[in-house]
UniProtKB/Swiss-Prot annotation:
Belongs to the UPF0677 family. Its EC number is 2.1.1.-. S-adenosyl-L-methionine binds at residues 129, 158-159. This is Putative S-adenosyl-L-methionine-dependent methyltransferase MAP_4190c. SUPFAM superfamilies: S-adenosyl-L-methionine-dependent methyltransferases. Keywords: Methyltransferase, S-adenosyl-L-methionine, Transferase. It holds the Pfam family LCM. GO terms for biological process: methylation. It comes from Mycolicibacterium paratuberculosis (strain ATCC BAA-968 / K-10) (Mycobacterium paratuberculosis). InterPro entries: Ppm1/Ppm2/Tcmp, SAM-dependent_MTases_sf, SAM_mthyl_Trfase_ML2640-like. GO terms for molecular function: methyltransferase activity. Signal peptide: none annotated.
Length: 306
């Protein structure tokens, strides 16, 4: 376990893991700007401004850029977040077109899909995250006059706690196929909690349920050296964050293999292929190459509950 993480630690959108959610929202805001915008997320920028972290505000205002950095220059960051966002957007769109009317966004952070996607009538979208993060986003978007485009139900709980019970108490229907997303989440969970997350998802899923997540197969992706390099880049942005304090390390099960063993039919989508599909050139920076073998994963539950 990272020395900076403790059992039961909590955060809002300006601290610890929560600040990384704001970082992602800032990237979506940048990708949504200008006549050649890659994304359409009009709520990302106001959420970032409401959090109030100066480096992220400067990023969305175009006042902080590192054109010499192949990972953190505005264009590279916009393309990276576009690949990721479009993958999960398309996942939910495809799931609802297949008839699924129940969705769960795990570690929802500042995700705005419950507000910006066109959900079919009768769709219920559950968002699960830390209480402070849920409250902040709900209040901020209400003050902006934004309204969900589906029935949005929030579950304020840490994913290391008994979130399945909280989800059921919130009205989740275990008899209905569900579209699940675990976006940008797994490194923030201990290895055993990652397995438990997928066990719980499987136990809660009716046949035909779908799941989207990511996997980095390189066991050295979060080595001390690489985490130090990530931290250096964050500090260059003016962020007082240490990657080694946020990520849990240790040997993990391969996501695709683990889900297959639980009865899911898994389809991996290598990041390089998704870059090409979106018309982008994959960055050849060493840090980006580390994640070049990363796969976005979608899966469908073929049998009964595990």
């Amino acid at each position: 376990m990272s020395e900076g993480r403790t059992d039961g630690d909590t955060w809002g959108p300006a601290q610890s893991v929560g600040a990384t959610a704001t970082m992602v929202a800032a990237a979506r805001a940048v990708a949504s700007q200008g006549p050649d915008a890659l994304l359409d997320d009009p709520l990302a920028e106001p959420l970032v401004r409401a959090v109030g972290l100066d480096p992220f505000i400067r990023i969305v205002e175009g006042k902080l850029d590192f054109p010499d950095d192949p990972l953190f220059n505005r264009r590279a960051r916009a393309e990276q977040i576009t690949v990721r966002t479009r993958f999960f957007d398309d996942f939910f769109i495809d799931a609802t077109e297949a008839g699924l009317r129940q969705a769960v966004i795990l570690a929802s952070g500042l995700d705005t899909r419950a507000y910006r996607l066109t959900w079919p009538a009768g769709t219920v979208v559950y968002e699960i995250d830390q209480p402070q993060v849920i409250a902040f986003k709900t209040d901020t978007l209400a003050n902006l006059g934004a309204a969900p485009t589906a029935e949005r139900r929030t579950i304020s709980i840490d994913l290391r706690d008994d979130w399945p019970a909280a989800l059921r108490e919130g009205g989740f229907d275990v008899t209905r196929p569900t579209a699940w997303s675990a976006e940008g989440l797994l490194p923030y969970l201990p290895p055993e909690a990652q397995d438990r997350l997928f066990d719980n998802i499987t136990a809660l899923s009716a046949p035909g349920s779908r799941l989207a997540t990511e996997h980095v197969p390189d066991p050295n992706a979060f080595s001390d050296e690489r985490l130090a390099r990530i931290s250096e880049r964050w500090q260059r942005l003016g962020l007082n964050l240490n990657a080694a304090d946020l990520f849990y390390r240790g040997e993990r099960n391969v996501v695709a293999d683990y889900l297959t063993g639980k009865g899911w039919r898994v389809t991996p989508h290598p990041a390089r292929q998704l870059y090409a599909r979106n018309g982008f050139e994959f960055p050849e920076d060493e840090m980006r190459a580390t994640f070049g073998e990363m796969s976005y994963v979608d899966a469908t539950l073929t049998g009964g509950r595990g």
